[in-house]
């Protein structure tokens, strides 16, 4: 099951993504009396029980939002920490003519470094160069 956070009327919502679109969990819960975690954090804390409750909700509510029309929020909207691994792609090390490190190169970022879907990325006026890099979250 794939989950997402998205914005609806300025409010952060939990969604479940399937082949038909995105189930708005908050809206679905307002149409039922089921006890289902209403945030990704609560869902993770609930473990398998929360997962089975969400599967039941998904089966009972057929209304979906079109995925392409949503404005997605970061998967974890308010992380305590953001730990990053640098130089983890061979192409990135060769681009800078560097040897691949033997041990992971770790660095941190502040939570305000997150940008939601279709949000502008703020660039410091002191920045001299920007470089793209794909980020993975596990």
Regions found by a protein language model. Name each.
Residues 12, 21-22, 111-113, 120, ...:
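Structural motif
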Residues 87-90, 110, 126:
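Beta-hairpin (beta-strand-turn-beta-strand) motif
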Residues 100-117, 132:
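Structural signature of FAD isoalloxazine-binding scaffolds in flavoprotein oxidoreductases
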Residues 30, 107-108, 122:
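Residue-level detector of alpha-helical recognition elements and their boundaries
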Residues 116-137:
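A structural-propensity feature for long, helix-poor, extended segments
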Residues 1-104:
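N-terminal non-catalytic cap/leader segment that marks the start of a structured domain
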Residues 63, 74, 113, 127-129:
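Generic secretory/membrane-interface signal
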